[in-house]
């Protein structure tokens, strides 16, 4: 028998010099089954092994990856050792097979329980409400073809349908990828030709618009400085044209550029007097432009303009009042000017006085 001795250490000596008591030894007897079992607890108190060995029990430790495992339909655990019932051929785990005298599935009385290990091999039919077990593969295949042929046909049709669907989807995906990756050359050529024609048409339209624009009129000239060539749609009276329309810059330019138009619509443009002669808005007084003596040649020469030539008389006719070049002097409304306007139909006024507007 194994004996264990426990000894208590003596305390330290005190100052009075008392002797310690003798050590006490306690003997503990250990049963024989603990010694035979060679347990780590019997070898020492409180010692722990550095590694714990875990050994999985049953089929799981020896089966390969991807291999199927049968589950017991009664306890819903993986089966390590089968208990095959005879005569119904239903298979359970060994514990569930021994737990009752009748079958759990068909309630048939159990005559014998056949023990089959995991590695020996067993075939169980997975058809609904069947679950019969077979020890040989030929017997299992014969049972399936004889009793469950309809299930095999349905499974084959489903597999064919799935394969056809997969193939159709693959073809559609490949067709879509081909159209996305490489379009037809004819389509590319047509698109390029359309783009070129559109760009060419735009360029032609732009050139035609530029060519169809009328020439811009010269707006740099101030009002009043126009060419002496008459417009085709306007008739000028038989008056002599002025020789030079250039004026000194000190003189204001008349804003009314349109010459007098001929009488239209059959009625006179001027009111008539008792004597039958027409009277203008300003009593027919005719004005002439300032000559070079009044403007002075020094002013025009200093500003860079050539001295203008003598201007001829301009007779303003029309329904609009003529502008006055001398805003400080207003035309007098006298009967003498009226008579002068009627008498002076010629051009020149040789006996006039410029300061008095024709008064003698």
Swiss-Prot record:
Provide the protein's localization: Nucleus speckle; Nucleus, Nucleoplasm
Q: Which cellular components does GO assign to this protein?
A: nuclear speck; RNA N6-methyladenosine methyltransferase complex
Bias-annotated ranges (Basic and acidic residues): 1-11
Broadest EC class assigned to this enzyme: transferase
InterPro entries cross-referenced by the UniProt entry? HAKAI-like_RING-HC (IPR040380), HAKAI/CBLL2 (IPR040383), Znf_C2H2_type (IPR013087), Znf_RING/FYVE/PHD (IPR013083), Znf_RING_CS (IPR017907)
Protein origin, superkingdom: Eukaryota
Keyword terms:
Metal-binding, Nucleus, Transferase, Ubl conjugation pathway, Zinc, Zinc-finger
Q: Does the keyword Ribonucleoprotein apply?
A: no
Which intervals hold the zinc fingers (C2H2-type)?
123-148
Span of zinc fingers (RING-type): 72-107
Q: Name one GO biological process term.
A: protein ubiquitination
Homology family: Belongs to the Hakai family.
Share what the entry says about its subunit structure, partners included. Interacts with MTB and VIR. Associates with MTA, MTB, FIP37 and VIR to form the m6A writer complex which is essential for adenosine methylation at specific mRNA sequences.
Q: What protein name applies here?
A: E3 ubiquitin-protein ligase HAKAI homolog
Instruction: Read off the lineage from the record.
Output: Eukaryota, Viridiplantae, Streptophyta, Embryophyta, Tracheophyta
The gene designation is HAKAI
């Amino acid at each position: 028998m194994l004996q264990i001795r426990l000894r208590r250490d003596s305390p330290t000596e005190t100052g009075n010099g008392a002797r310690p008591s003798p050590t006490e030894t306690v003997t503990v007897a250990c049963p024989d089954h603990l010694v035979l079992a060679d347990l780590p607890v019997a070898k020492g108190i409180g010692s722990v092994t550095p590694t714990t060995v875990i050994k999985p029990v049953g089929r799981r430790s020896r089966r390969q990856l991807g291999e199927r495992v049968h589950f017991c339909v009664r306890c819903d655990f993986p089966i390590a050792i089968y208990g095959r019932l005879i005569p119904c051929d239903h298979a359970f785990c060994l514990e569930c097979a021994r737990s009752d005298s009748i079958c759990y599935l068909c309630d048939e009385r159990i005559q014998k329980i056949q023990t089959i290990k995991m590695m020996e091999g067993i075939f169980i039919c997975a058809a609904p409400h069947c679950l019969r077990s077979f020890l040989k593969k030929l017997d299992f295949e014969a049972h399936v073809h004889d009793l469950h042929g309809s299930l095999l046909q349905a499974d084959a049709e489903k597999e064919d349908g799935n394969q056809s669907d997969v193939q159709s989807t693959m073809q559609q995906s490949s067709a879509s990828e081909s159209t996305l990756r490489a379009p037809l050359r004819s389509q590319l050529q047509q698109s390029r030709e359309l783009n070129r024609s559109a760009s060419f048409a735009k360029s032609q339209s732009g050139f035609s618009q530029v060519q169809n624009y009328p020439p811009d009129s010269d707006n740099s000239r101030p009002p009043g400085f126009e060419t002496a060539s008459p417009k085709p749609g306007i008739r000028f009276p038989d008056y002599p044209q002025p020789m030079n329309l250039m004026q000194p810059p000190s003189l204001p330019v008349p804003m009314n550029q349109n010459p007098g138009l001929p009488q239209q619509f059959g009625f006179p443009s001027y009111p008539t007097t008792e004597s039958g002669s027409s009277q203008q808005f300003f009593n027919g007084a005719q004005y002439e432009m300032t000559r070079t003596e009044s403007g002075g040649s020094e002013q025009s020469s200093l500003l860079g303009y050539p001295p203008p030539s003598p201007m001829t008389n301009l007779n303003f006719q029309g329904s609009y009042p003529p502008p006055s070049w001398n805003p400080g002097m207003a035309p007098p409304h006298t009967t003498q000017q009226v008579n002068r306007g009627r008498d002076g139909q010629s051009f020149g006024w040789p006996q006039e006085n410029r300061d008095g507007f024709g008064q003698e």
